[in-house]
Amino acid sequence: MVNLGEQMIYKTGDVTKATETGLKFLPHIVNCYGVAGSGVVCAIEKMERNPIQQYRNWYKQRYYEQQIFGTDVVRDIHFELGEVQFVESGEFIVCNMVAQKWQEEVNCKQVPAIRLWALQECMERVAEQIKLLDNFSCLVCPKFGSMRAGANWDRDIVPLIENIWKDFDIIIYEY
């Protein structure tokens, strides 16, 4: 059963060491170039089954087979903006959300690396997967998208969380 707690709590600490009980989804943003090595990725890389290496493999192969939770259905997930790779790691399901491209300059203005349309699609995919599980506990998240990716946490990310993940308990970890 999905936990309909409808609350967002902020904590200080390492999101990969979240102490909440039960199955936790850990969504974070990855880029569409297969490059990772800073921020929360450094902690996720040390987790069981190395979700970051799985992301790099997904990038190299350009697709992977993902079993849809709670079903026998297997779907090919192509590596592109807006897609999510789900990697089980102990009590976590790490969600590698492809929502970032290099910064660009358009009409002499810097465009942030984050692609909010892609992040929205990723977050919707995460919500769909959560709803298929009856042992889901909560989402434990870093402040994704608001540092190197260039989004404003309060203006850009929080409204997406409140809209798409409104039915779930969410713990935001600030490191």
Annotate the PLM regions.
Residues M1-Y175:
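Macrodomain-like recognition of ADP-ribose-binding/processing modules
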